[in-house]
Amino acid sequence: MLKYFFILFFLIFTAHSNASNKNKIIENLKNTNNLDFNFEQNVNGKIENGNCTIEYPKKIFCEYAKSSNKILVSNGKSLIIKTLTSYYRYPLNKTPLNFILDKNFLINKVKVLEERIVDGSLINYTIKENDIEINIFFDKETHDLIGWQNTDIYQNFNITFLSSIRKNRIISKNIFELPAQN
């Protein structure tokens, strides 16, 4: 009988813990209007890093370090990747960032998806939408978004980790203006 009590207690505790994580992540997302952070991105083994600013919904500006002045910008509709020698424009809604940059979408997914604890410190949700699979990671202590993993539009495996996250800062709105073509 005691064995069944412990099993029941463990199941209730685990369910409460999962619900608590979900609620804290959802509340954190609801209270976040923008964030800036450093990032490290691994695309098929090629590592790049830099700094990004996200403004919900669907706006992002990233400057890459040590790379021919590479920037990534979304105004909420289009996504531009620009270097000194190249300029690529994509409809945002055809990229995984369309989902990652939409906090209401993330909130709705977190509500219904099963969480997975990774290494005791990360909370992971796997989102499958429109033939796109994205693993979203949140910090178990702060409940901040701290990364994602997906396959990009070129079928490259992409892992992005965030650090030095700052939320709800005053940001210049013009950083999300799309840059002119080279």
Annotate each PLM feature:
Residues 4-13:
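Sec-dependent N-terminal signal peptides
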Residues 27-47:
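A short, Trp-centered hydrophobic/proline-enriched beta-strand micro-motif
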Residues 31, 53-59, 74-78, 120, ...:
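Short, solvent-exposed coil/turn segments at beta-strand boundaries
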Residues 84-122, 127:
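Flexible, surface-exposed loop/linker segments and immediately adjacent secondary-structure boundaries
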Residues 109-110, 114-182:
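Gly/Pro-enriched, hydrophobic low-complexity segments
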